[in-house]
């Protein structure tokens, strides 16, 4: 990984071609931050369209590339129109399945973006997709000049995980105007959180294919791994692993085809083979035709579109490969940058030591696997085996949902990466394609597994750690907001919020305001429009409006988010990955529904929340036990984790707390693209407009809806005279 050097000259010296890293046989370890000048890091990021599986030739001509798993060769299509249509020539071959030396001529591939192995236009960052990892020091200023070189799309940018000024959080028409094509916008963020963050540039911000780059904030150089009890371990290698579920067609088209046009049967594309009609997904045993299989799971920009190849011959595929040494500690920074599916991650025959979630420490725990949902970030490390039994182990990622296969089975979509030992280890090539897909250890009667961040109980003997079980071991000065007590009304606010796939947020589907509210005398909100919420719950109506909530500046804010509501045939119950932008919160309670004796079937919604008639939407919920009001919540965690993204379990609820210290306009949203697009979001203002920090004088504000005022009599007469001259 190449780290940008902080320099004022960076803005004018970076060239797109020199900065692109392209395809690499081995993933590069994250290196130390670049030089810090005047306590800031500066970056230039150009967002431009790029065709995956292509390479650039002389004079900016593009050559189309394909990988052939039958031969293990990279082939270039012959562009001469006088030659046969399917003619290709081989430009690189593999050597052996273990030493995948794909590129004899590395210059040919210095800009190759692989993704799912097919040809798609992606919004690259300085020629790479995902963009290169940015590494900065804690408590420094991050100056990012974003240039929008896309052909058609505007964009905004934000850092998912930092808590900064409200007008630099990138929500179009709430916090800033979109950056127009061929325009630039300079963002200034403060690295006030340690850990793994996500730089995201897109418009709308919940688009299924955004521009992404990881941002790593470190406290000190040569950091060590905290393992509890004041002990620490050296880090010998440190890798980024960005995970994407890649769609066949853009997720917004899938959603529109099902909900608006009734074309869900062809959710994988109208022009695909007739045998490719979708049957939807199986989610926790329920069928849902609205959820479509991703084309691939892509790890660090490398995946493969054909699941048969992934399952039967992974050794010949061009996968992300991470190198490790026996006995060494290797840190993985996981970021789910995908659009819809939650995933489960495990590494063959290796335990994971979970250390960080969403940029904050967790209580160190040894786990066997972890679930990650869109927007979540986790750090875990593994210790290399002293005597590895094979040279290559597999990192296995699979979707939470299951999808139909040609032989009438239901299986997850799988993605793979290689964990390769640098030592010379004898490898039986006959078992190169054998993969421990479902972690045999977890199915054995003599052992059990520990799985972190489970959205619901698991089958078998596995121990499930919910998001609320991860803890926060660091000392902090916010313990006063974590007490189980009745708080005074002038220091505490409690908000009950219904968040559900079917009824969205409190029955409202979010719509952007017509102008940036800070500059508007009156912004029309959901409170200005009548809404038949019973019709919403029954699926007969939609209340789409600017949903705004008000939080008091300086107060302790408690949000009780409950995922309960009507059940409809053909719509599976799903957890909601919830993100509170620009704000870290304490997850003081995570509570699921009540399950039947099998531990899988939901018997009833959690009875802590008052919801007498779920079919009418559970709006206006409250505590069933009124003594829990104003902060006196029963069953609170003794050591609640500090998060910015967490799943709200179906049939259950979460309780989060934070102190509202920064006045401004902010967003809360589902990070699942289909839900965000359909309106699972709300805006909130902390403080009054008089308390909100005003953006700089030249901050762009001329966007949104403009309605010309009526013409005066004199103006109409002037127009009439001009027309009749």
What are the residue ranges of the model-derived segments?
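N-terminal signal peptide
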Residues: 2, 10-27
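Histidine-centered copper-binding motifs that mark active-site loops
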Residues: 23-381, 386-388, 403-475, 495, ...
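Generic recognition of flexible, low-complexity loop/linker segments
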Residues: 131-132, 318-321, 331-333, 342, ...
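Histidine-centered catalytic micro-motifs
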Residues: 157-158, 197-207, 559, 576-585, ...
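Short, surface-exposed ligand- or partner-binding patches at beta-edge/loop junctions that are enriched
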Residues: 196-204, 388-402, 661-674
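Active/binding-pocket-proximal capping segment
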Residues: 348-362, 573-631, 673-677, 684-691
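C-terminal substrate/ligand-recognition segments
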Residues: 528-530, 538-587, 647
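C-terminal structured "cap/appendage" subdomains that terminate the fold
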Residues: 624-676, 684
């Amino acid at each position: 990984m190449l780290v940008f050097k902080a320099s004022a000259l960076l803005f004018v010296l970076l060239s797109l071609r020199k900065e692109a890293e392209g395809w690499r046989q081995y993933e590069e370890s994250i290196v130390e931050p670049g030089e810090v000048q005047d306590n800031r890091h500066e970056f230039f990021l150009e967002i431009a369209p790029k065709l995956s599986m292509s390479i650039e030739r002389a004079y900016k001509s593009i050559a189309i590339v394909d990988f052939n798993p039958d031969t293990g060769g990279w082939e270039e299509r012959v562009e001469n129109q006088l030659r046969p249509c399917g003619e290709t020539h081989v430009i690189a071959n593999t050597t052996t399945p273990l030493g995948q030396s794909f590129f004899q001529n590395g210059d040919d591939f210095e800009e190759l973006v692989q993704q799912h192995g097919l040809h798609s236009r992606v919004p690259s960052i300085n020629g790479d997709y995902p963009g290169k990892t940015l590494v900065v020091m804690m408590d420094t200023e991050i100056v990012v000049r974003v240039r929008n070189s896309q052909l058609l799309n505007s964009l905004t940018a934000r850092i998912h995980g930092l808590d900064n000024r409200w007008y630099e959080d990138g929500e179009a028409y709430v916090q800033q105007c979109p950056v127009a094509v061929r325009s630039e916008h300079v963002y200034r963020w403060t690295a006030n959180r340690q850990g793994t963050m996500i730089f995201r540039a897109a418009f709308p911000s919940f688009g299924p294919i955004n521009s992404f780059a990881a941002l790593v904030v470190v406290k000190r150089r040569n950091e060590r791994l905290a393992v509890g009890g004041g002990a620490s371990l050296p880090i010998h290698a440190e890798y980024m692993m960005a995970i994407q579920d890649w769609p066949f067609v853009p997720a917004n088209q899938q959603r529109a085809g099902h909900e608006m046009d009734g074309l869900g049967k062809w959710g994988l594309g109208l022009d695909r083979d007739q045998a490719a009609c979708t049957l939807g997904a199986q989610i926790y045993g329920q069928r849902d035709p609205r959820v479509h299989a991703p084309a691939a799971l892509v790890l660090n920009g490398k995946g493969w579109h054909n699941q048969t190849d992934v399952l039967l011959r992974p050794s010949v595929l061009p996968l992300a490969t991470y190198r490790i040494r026996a006995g060494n500690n290797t840190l993985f920074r996981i970021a789910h940058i995908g659009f819809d599916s939650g995933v489960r991650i495990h590494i063959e025959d290796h335990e994971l030591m979970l250390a960080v979630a969403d940029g904050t420490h967790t209580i160190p725990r040894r786990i066997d696997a972890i679930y990650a949902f869109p927007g979540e970030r986790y750090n875990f490390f593994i210790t290399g085996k002293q005597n590895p039994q094979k040279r290559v182990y597999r990192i296995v990622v699979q979707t939470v949902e299951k999808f139909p296969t040609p032989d009438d089975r239901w299986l997850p979509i799988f993605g793979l990466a290689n964990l390769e030992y640098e030592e010379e280890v004898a490898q039986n090539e006959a078992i190169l394609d054998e993969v421990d897909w479902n972690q045999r250890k977890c199915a054995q009667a003599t052992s059990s597994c520990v799985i972190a961040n489970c959205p619901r109980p698991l089958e078998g003997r596995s121990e499930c750690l919910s998001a609320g079980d991860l803890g926060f071991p660091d000392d902090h000065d916010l313990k006063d907001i974590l007490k189980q007590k009745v708080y005074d009304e002038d220091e505490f606010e409690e908000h009950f919020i219904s968040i559900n796939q079917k009824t969205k947020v409190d029955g409202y589907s979010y719509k952007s305001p017509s102008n940036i509210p800070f500059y508007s005398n009156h912004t029309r909100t959901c409170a200005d429009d009548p809404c038949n919420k019973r019709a919403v719950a029954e699926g007969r109506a939609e209340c789409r409006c600017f949903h705004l909530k008000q939080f008091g500046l300086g107060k302790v804010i408690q949000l009780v988010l409950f995922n309960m509501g009507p059940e409809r045939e053909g719509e599976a119950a799903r957890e909601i990955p919830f993100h509170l932008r620009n704000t870290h919160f304490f997850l003081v309670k995570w509570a699921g529904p009540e399950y039947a004796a099998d531990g899988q079937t939901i018997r009833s919604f959690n009875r802590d929340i008052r919801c007498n008639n779920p079919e009418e939407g559970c709006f206006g919920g409250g505590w069933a036990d009124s003594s829990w009001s104003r902060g006196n919540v029963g069953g609170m965690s003794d050591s609640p984790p500090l998060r910015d993204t967490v799943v709200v379990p179906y049939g259950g609820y979460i309780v989060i707390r934070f102190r509202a210290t920064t006045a401004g306009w902010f967003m809360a949203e589902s990070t699942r693209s289909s839900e965000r697009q359909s309106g699972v979001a709300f805006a909130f203002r902390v403080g009054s407009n008089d308390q909100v920090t005003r953006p700089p004088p030249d901050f762009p504000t001329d966007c949104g809806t403009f309605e010309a005022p009526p013409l005066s009599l004199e103006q109409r007469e002037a127009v009439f005279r001009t027309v009749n001259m």
